């Protein structure tokens, strides 16, 4: 005789499905704002500290997928969730550097032992970085030895990147020279990965080769960048050659980040500063991190030029958090405060440094 189904079977199935959903959220490594239980329920013993929001902390910010507005405290929740925080910049954008400095300042204060990693420094410069952190050389010598003074544009290092390194020095925190030396980047283009893989071990320590192919959209974006948005013809073989260099940048930075993450205390975080092309749309850098550390939780932040009161459609999907560079200002009309319309935007500069790719 056929047994009638137990009347609680449906409830049990729903409960099982709910548990599976919660487990899936808990295991998410890409979007902290999908983890609703985590986001709305503080950890036991934690406290909520209101932050005064001014300067870079007051800028307009939105969730990069659905456009929901967030504030600095919401961004901070994402940082708290993450193991690795990637902050993408346009190299000449002052607002982006102020956001990076604020994120690093608060991260290293909240989680001592965290590390800051920079695209702008190369592995063969790590000894110079360490000498500066140890007080063996002064800032002027550090900048001279690394040739960094004009890295983003003439005379910008002192304002854009040195404050981050000085904050790390004061906090006794590691600074990671994450990138591959430019000679090896060039050789990736001219000689290919097989030739680099055959180099002696001491040289191979200066770079990492890609662990996986990037998303197909990454090459398409790179081709578009090389063609100036389709304004000029580009040779497809040339695109692939230059993309080899770009991918080795991504792989070496990812390898540096993951190595730092693995040797830091369990509570500590890695904050990586990088040109936004590398990290947007989960591009080459993020895919290389995931290939090397699939269980590391990665938060991506991108800072865009210009003002916005909502997520711009062209920025959807670029990062977990999209920040716009100028906060709307209040103006008074009678007894009501209203938002002052943003000034007319100037198109963002898209020129690359002479030695490579910018964004």
Predicted ranges, named:
Residues 67-68, 72-109:
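Zymogen propeptides
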Residues 35-50, 252-255, 261-264, 268, ...:
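C-terminal regions of proteins
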Residues 110, 115, 122, 126-260:
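A substrate-binding/cap region within the structured catalytic cores of diverse enzymes
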Residues 28-82:
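N- or domain-start disorder-to-order transition segments that initiate the globular core
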Residues 23-26:
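C-terminal motif of bacterial Sec signal peptides marking the signal peptidase cleavage site
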Residues 90-93, 121-125, 181-185, 276-279, ...:
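Solvent-exposed loop/turn segments at secondary-structure junctions
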Residues 57, 80-90, 141-148, 236:
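Acidic/histidine-rich, surface-exposed loop or edge segments in extracytoplasmic proteins
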């Amino acid at each position: 005789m056929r047994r009638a189904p137990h009347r609680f079977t449906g409830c049990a199935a729903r409960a099982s499905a709910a548990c599976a959903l919660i487990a899936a959220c808990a295991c998410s490594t890409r979007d902290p704002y999908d983890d609703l239980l985590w986001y709305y329920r503080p950890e036991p013993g934690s406290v909520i500290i209101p932050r005064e929001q001014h300067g870079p902390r007051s800028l307009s910010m939105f969730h990069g997928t659905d456009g929901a507005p967030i504030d600095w405290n919401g961004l901070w929740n994402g940082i708290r969730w993450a193991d690795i925080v990637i902050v993408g910049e346009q190299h000449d954008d002052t607002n982006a550097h102020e956001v990076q400095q604020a994120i690093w300042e608060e991260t290293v204060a909240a989680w001592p032992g965290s590390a800051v990693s920079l695209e702008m420094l190369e592995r063969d410069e790590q000894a110079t970085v360490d000498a500066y952190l140890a007080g063996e050389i002064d800032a002027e010598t550090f900048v001279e030895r690394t040739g960094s003074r004009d890295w983003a544009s003439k005379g910008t290092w002192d304002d854009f990147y040195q404050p981050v390194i000085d904050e790390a020095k004061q906090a006794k925190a590691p600074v990671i020279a994450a990138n591959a030396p430019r000679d090896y980047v060039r050789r990736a283009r001219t000689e290919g990965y097989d030739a680099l893989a055959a180099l002696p071990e001491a040289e191979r320590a200066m770079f990492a080769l890609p662990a996986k192919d990037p998303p197909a959209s990454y090459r398409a974006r790179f081709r578009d960048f090389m063609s100036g948005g389709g304004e000029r013809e580009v040779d497809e073989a040339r695109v692939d050659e230059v993309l080899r260099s770009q991918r080795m940048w991504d792989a070496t930075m990812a390898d540096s980040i993951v190595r730092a993450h693995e040797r830091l205390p369990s509570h500590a975080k890695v904050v990586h500063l990088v040109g936004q092309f590398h990290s947007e749309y989960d591009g080459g850098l993020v895919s290389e991190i995931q290939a090397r550390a699939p269980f590391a939780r990665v938060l991506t932040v991108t800072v865009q030029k210009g003002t916005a009161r909502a997520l711009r459609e062209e920025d959807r999907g670029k990062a977990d958090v999209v920040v716009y560079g100028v906060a709307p200002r209040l103006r008074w009309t009678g007894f009501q405060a209203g938002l002052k319309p943003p000034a007319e935007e100037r198109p963002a500069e898209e020129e690359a440094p002479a030695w490579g790719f910018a964004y």
